[in-house]
Amino acid sequence: MKRRRVLGSLAVTCAVLVAATLVFVNVGRSQRVPKAEAAPIEIATTLPSWNGMSLRDTAVQWAAFCGEEHPTDMRFVETTRQRAAKLLDGAKVDSDNACYAVVLHGNFVDTMAFMPYGAQPPRGTTMAFIVRSSDGAMTDFGLNDLPYADLDTLGTVKAIAP
């Protein structure tokens, strides 16, 4: 009899805890403020260029190197290399110079990558790279399938006209 009473009390206590947890979780959800719609991205009217080659030229050229003749949704942001590398690939890099972080979409295959014999080349729907502001040298490059929706955390994002 005593055991039945203890088990009954335990069951009631568990039910109350589960109900309280569900109420707490749902209250938290209802109080969240929905994220505002992203502001339209301004198309850059002037692009950085070095020795007659613009940032757009660099993006289109590297897309072509990776098999994509018509990349879409090309964007860039002026930032520092440390911040860009951390966002784009989670890396800590050896310099923190001013740079442009560039992201574009398409179907990319890096056939120029060094890889073991028989290995498949890197592929991705997103190309991300970092270009040094001072001379246009590409310091970082990668392919993946990430959208980089939070590129605006690095600064003002601008679109590159197709």
Sequence positions of predicted segments:
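N-terminal Sec-pathway targeting helices
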Residues: 1-15, 24-26
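Extended hydrophobic/Leu-rich segments
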Residues: 6-10, 50, 80, 146, ...
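Sec-dependent signal peptide cleavage junction
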Residues: 22-36
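Short, non-transmembrane alpha-helical segments in secretory-pathway proteins
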Residues: 33-97, 160-162
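Exposed beta-strand-loop-beta-strand "reactive/processing" segments of non-cytosolic proteins
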Residues: 71-129
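A short, surface-exposed interaction/processing loop segment used at functional sites
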Residues: 117-162
